[in-house]
């Protein structure tokens, strides 16, 4: 029931009224975070701040635990993760943010690759569990601190701090979910069909994709492959021929083959969604 409530609240959060960028530039003018804020990110993941011409956006004002958690849940859902509970509608201290964010990231598999020492001198009142979660955030460059030696754990989290922190979380999630691959080759033909073929070898998975184009002259490559909830999504970079270039009106096919290392993938079956193809083919 909690998970359903969370999903409903995120849907409401994303369906807030029309968003414009009218006043955010004014409110960030001269602010230390001006160059760090991605306006599109704010509009998408913090729509309650962007609503009505960013009327609720005040960089140095505090953000509630519920608003922060809803934005975090919305971000997680974009990477096929989820969690229950949306927090309390009260102030959120920086150490409580560490507890909430660190525990959620730990649950989805983020870990400390190096046991780097935390430099902050004002964390002696934090529990040992919270300090380990802080280490996780610090090691992954999600939380840097008020200064090189100060975290200010008891201070309430501000709107602009929440935005910057979740922007860094997005970068971490992107890295966690990106699958490295090797392009083996691409060929063009005039007699084929759109399809996706998956072949398993001892240590590798070979994926062959064929896409139809209305004329020759198109280029096709894979931009990235991302892990999803029950498989992987392949994102393509497709460029049409130059508009002033004469092309015969002949249907052509591009067949692209990529290689993925099994040890970087989850357990089979290997399900792939082709971005733009609207189909899923599994092995």
Name these PLM-found stretches.
Residues 71, 146, 237-239:
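Active-site-proximal beta-strand/loop segments in catalytic clefts of secreted hydrolases
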Residues 21-23, 34-35, 41-42, 109-119, ...:
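Exposed, flexible binding/inhibitory loops of compact, secreted disulfide-stabilized domains
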Residues 4-38, 46-66, 73-131, 144-159, ...:
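Feature responds to low-complexity, polar/acidic, surface-exposed segments characteristic
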């Amino acid at each position: 029931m909690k998970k359903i409530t969370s999903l409903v609240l995120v849907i409401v959060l994303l369906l807030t009224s029309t968003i414009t960028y009218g006043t955010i530039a004014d409110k960030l003018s001269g602010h230390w975070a001006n160059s760090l804020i991605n306006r599109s990110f704010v509009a998408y993941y913090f729509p309650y701040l962007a609503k009505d011409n960013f009327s609720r956006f005040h960089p140095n004002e505090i953000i509630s635990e519920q608003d922060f958690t809803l934005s975090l849940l919305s971000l997680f859902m974009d990477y096929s993760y989820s969690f229950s509970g949306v927090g309390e509608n009260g102030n959120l201290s920086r150490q409580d943010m560490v507890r909430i964010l660190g525990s959620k990231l730990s649950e989805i598999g983020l870990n400390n690759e190096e046991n780097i020492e935390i430099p902050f001198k004002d964390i002696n009142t934090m529990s040992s569990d919270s300090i380990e979660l802080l280490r996780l955030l610090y090691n992954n460059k999600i939380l840097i601190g008020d200064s090189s030696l100060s975290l200010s754990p008891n201070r309430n989290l501000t709107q602009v701090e929440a935005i910057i922190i979740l922007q860094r979380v997005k970068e971490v999630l992107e890295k966690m979910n990106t699958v490295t691959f090797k392009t083996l080759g691409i060929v063009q033909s005039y007699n084929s069909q759109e399809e996706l073929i998956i072949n398993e070898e001892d240590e590798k998975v070979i994926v062959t994709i064929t896409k139809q184009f209305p004329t020759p002259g198109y280029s096709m490559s894979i931009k990235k492959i991302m892990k999803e909830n029950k498989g992987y999504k392949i994102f393509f970079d497709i460029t049409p021929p130059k508009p002033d270039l004469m092309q015969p009106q002949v249907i052509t096919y591009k067949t692209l083959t990529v290689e993925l290392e099994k040890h970087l993938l989850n357990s089979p079956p290997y399900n792939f969604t082709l971005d733009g193809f609207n189909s899923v083919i599994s092995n």
